[in-house]
């Protein structure tokens, strides 16, 4: 079921799955990340760690987007409001061939 919370996530090219997370837990999930509480916990810990690096005098988070890259896939993590959006995408980038 597509909701306003997830409708944009459904249309991302090469998307293998997604999570929508708040401090209270997983709000929505689909694909390879459906009901993946473990990955949600790991991602939230990474976000909390990155948020410790705030600049003095700013209320904004120190980042809005974070990518965790593996050989075959990428986790694209975006913070919007009080929610963390995680999309697992196929990694189509390959190292250039040097001839």
UniProtKB/Swiss-Prot annotation:
Can you say where in the cell this protein is located? Lysosome
Gene Ontology CC annotation, any one = lysosome
Where this protein primarily resides, as one coarse class? other
Q: Which Gene Ontology BP annotations are present?
A: cellular response to amino acid stimulus; positive regulation of TOR signaling; positive regulation of TORC1 signaling; protein localization to lysosome; regulation of cell size
Which keywords does UniProt give here?
Lysosome, Phosphoprotein
Similarity comment: Belongs to the LAMTOR4 family.
- Assembly information from the UniProt record: Part of the Ragulator complex composed of lamtor1, lamtor2, lamtor3, lamtor4 and lamtor5. The Ragulator complex interacts with slc38a9; the probable amino acid sensor. Component of the lysosomal folliculin complex (LFC).
What is this protein for, i.e. what is its function? As part of the Ragulator complex it is involved in amino acid sensing and activation of mTORC1, a signaling complex promoting cell growth in response to growth factors, energy levels, and amino acids. Activated by amino acids through a mechanism involving the lysosomal V-ATPase, the Ragulator plays a dual role for the small GTPases Rag (RagA/RRAGA, RagB/RRAGB, RagC/RRAGC and/or RagD/RRAGD): it (1) acts as a guanine nucleotide exchange factor (GEF), activating the small GTPases Rag and (2) mediates recruitment of Rag GTPases to the lysosome membrane.
Q: What is this protein called?
A: Ragulator complex protein LAMTOR4
Q: What is the phylogenetic placement of the source species in the record?
A: Eukaryota, Metazoa, Chordata, Craniata, Vertebrata
């Amino acid at each position: 079921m597509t909701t306003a919370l997830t409708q944009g996530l459904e249309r991302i090219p090469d998307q293998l799955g997604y999570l929508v997370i708040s401090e209270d837990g997983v709000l929505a999930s689909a694909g390879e990340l459906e009901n993946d509480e473990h990955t949600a916990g790991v991602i939230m810990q990474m976000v909390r760690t990155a948020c410790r690096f705030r600049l003095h005098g700013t209320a904004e988070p120190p980042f809005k987007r974070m990518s965790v890259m593996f050989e075959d896939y990428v986790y694209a993590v975006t913070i919007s409001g009080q929610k963390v959006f995680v999309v697992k995408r196929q990694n189509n980038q390959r190292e250039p061939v040097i001839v």
